[in-house]
């Protein structure tokens, strides 16, 4: 097994930077490519943001010993939560329901609800969670999210159970 480095700050800060890049890419797709996020996408964004914040706090704190395990545990729980949402969305994309479960699209909300009711729904996201609007290398955004949450979970497990350099 690969040993954990003595100074874990760069590792935590790299996780933060990676999460920030993922969130920035999601915002790019939303604002410049016109891909509206569904509620599950928004939940995954929150999970990536939380993974990033935990990693940033850990990077600034520079924990040792049990502190590394605490941050690793928090990262693991957050990655598993986000990964479960991404896995559910991946399942929905593979086996789409006959009636979309994620709620109405943006146009329908703006036409059917007063603005005061539509704004909170818009913030939560719009669109059908089973729709595949973007792919890269044959994988949808939900698939890529699942892979990234899986990588974060593996890193967290390494932090929890990896051999320490003395």
Curated annotation (Swiss-Prot):
Cytoplasmic side of the membrane: what ranges? 1-11, 64-70, 163-166
Transmembrane portions of the chain: 12-28, 47-63, 71-87, 144-162
Q: What is this protein called?
A: Disulfide bond formation protein B
In which family does this protein belong, per the annotation? Belongs to the DsbB family.
Organism listed in the record = Azoarcus sp. (strain BH72)
> Which residues form each disulfide bond in the chain?
38-41, 102-129
Q: Where in the cell is it found?
A: Cell inner membrane
Its annotated function is as follows: Required for disulfide bond formation in some periplasmic proteins. Acts by oxidizing the DsbA protein.
What are the UniProt keywords, alphabetically? Answer: Cell inner membrane, Cell membrane, Chaperone, Disulfide bond, Electron transport, Membrane, Oxidoreductase, Redox-active center, Transmembrane, Transmembrane helix, Transport
Q: In terms of one coarse class, where is the protein primarily found?
A: membrane
GO molecular function (one)? electron transfer activity
Lineage of the species this protein comes from: Bacteria, Pseudomonadati, Pseudomonadota, Betaproteobacteria, Rhodocyclales
Q: Which residues lie on this side of the membrane: Periplasmic?
A: 29-46, 88-143
- The yes or no answer to whether the keyword Cell inner membrane is present is yes
